[in-house]
Design a protein with these regions (language model features):
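Periplasmic-binding protein-like
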Residues: 86-94, 152-154, 186-187
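Flexible loop/hinge segments that line or gate small-molecule binding clefts
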Residues: 93-135, 180
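N-terminal helix-turn-helix DNA-binding module of bacterial transcription factors
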Residues: 1-25
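Hinge/beta->alpha junction and helix N-cap segments in small-molecule ligand-binding domains
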Residues: 34-47, 65-74, 128-138, 154-175, ...
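Short beta-strand segments enriched in small/hydrophobic residues
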Residues: 22-40, 142, 150-156
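Non-catalytic positions within long, well-ordered alpha-helices that form the structural scaffold/packing
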Residues: 82-83, 106, 144-147
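Short, well-structured alpha-helical segments in soluble
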Residues: 73-87
Length: 192
């Protein structure tokens, strides 16, 4: 098994693709999901996954949804996993910047798209997300127009890039509206 892993790692470093991956009729993507419920319509991740699968289906892509744990990420390198399983690319949902595989994406040659995260300086890795500044400012403006002057902010985990961005957007919008930010009312959570 150790030799097999070494061969796969070497193949990845050399840019190898299987013959099956090169065929146009065999188009396979994976959606890695972490820290998010997605199996029923009321779950936050349900619509994200459904939209991705529907869009991929229109262009004849097969999509596998793969729940990921920290142990799963430690068991195998991202590039090796992708090559071994014949995936042409991946979509990452619910990951944070301290995840093992996100760190490996800094050097990957296998296309990846991140939802609400960002890896700089790798042309093979893109991201999509929300406009935190506009969204949070619209919410603050709405509350301000309703007469609220003491506004709380419940954020995601403190180690998340997107949470830091949203926190800054909250501070900026509060300042724009001449409102005081009360630190005890602007807190981080962990989505549980």
């Amino acid at each position: 098994e150790e030799l097999r892993q070494l061969v796969l790692d070497t193949a990845v470093e050399m840019g190898y693709q299987t013959k099956k991956m090169k065929k146009e009729e065999f188009k396979k993507l994976c959606l890695f999901i972490k820290n998010m419920d997605y199996e029923s319509p009321e779950d936050f991740g349900y619509d994200i996954i459904l939209g991705f699968k529907q869009s991929a289906f229109r262009d004849n892509w097969n999509v596998d949804v793969i729940p990921v744990t920290p142990d799963f990420q430690l068991s195998e390198k991202y590039d090796t996993y992708m090559l071994k399983n014949g995936y042409s690319g991946a979509f990452f949902v619910g990951f944070s910047l301290h995840d093992t595989w996100l760190d490996q994406l800094r050097d990957t040659k296998i296309p990846a798209v991140l939802f609400d995260n960002y890896i700089p300086n790798n042309p093979h890795v893109s991201y999509i997300g929300t406009d935190n500044d506009e969204g949070i400012d619209a919410a603050i403006e709405h509350l301000y127009q309703l007469g609220h002057r003491k506004i709380a902010f419940l954020n995601g985990p403190s180690y998340s890039m997107i949470s830091k961005s949203r926190h800054q957007a909250f501070i900026d919008s509060m300042e724009k509206h001449d409102l005081i930010v009360h630190p005890e009312l602007a807190v981080y959570g962990d989505f549980s």
